[in-house]
Amino acid sequence: LSQYWGKGDTRSIRSILSIMYRVTLALSLLFTAAARFFPELILSLFSSDPLVIAAGSRYLALVCFSYTLNGMTNVMLMSLRSVGTVGISILVYSSSFFANTALNWVLIFGKLGFPALGMEGAAIATIIARALELTIASVYLFGFEKKIGYTLRDVAVYDRSFAKDFAINVTPVM
């Protein structure tokens, strides 16, 4: 993206972003499905303790719903940083940090009238924090950002030449 920004080619930046959203969506949904339907199998790769696997599976089966939210937010913020807009990342991640911390306190321990949910509460807090991140980043990108000029209409644009270049240049890195 930075090379296109240096050339002032915002059309190409928008095309690449659309491809990145598609790839991120596909991969995050794949990982979400794996974590949702096979949490025990995934955790058994890291631990043989049945108590750890059982507890971790409950958490993983919930927190996996944050993967797509996190992926989309990261694409937005990475693109903004590529064109020199870095302040929004600080706002997004600071807001998320404080929201997640507060929600963890409330949902894990059952404060402010909420039931104590333990690990499930931590997963729910994480999902809410990731939704907050995506909301703030989306409002900024689609409502206030003027350098790239990315709109909701651009999400549907598919440029085959950029898709081919993207696959050639990005696949080895992945």
Model segments located where?
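Glycan-recognition patch characteristic of GH18 chitinases/ENGases
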Residues: 110
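Alpha-helical transmembrane segments of multi-pass membrane transporters/permeases
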Residues: 24, 79-106, 123-127
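Membrane-embedded alpha-helical transmembrane segments of multi-pass integral membrane proteins
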Residues: 73, 103, 133-136
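Short alpha-helical transmembrane segments in multi-pass integral membrane proteins
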Residues: 1-66, 114-171
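Interfacial helix-capping/hinge residues at the ends of transmembrane alpha-helices
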Residues: 39-40, 74-77, 104
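Hydrophobic alpha-helical transmembrane segments of polytopic membrane proteins
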Residues: 63-76
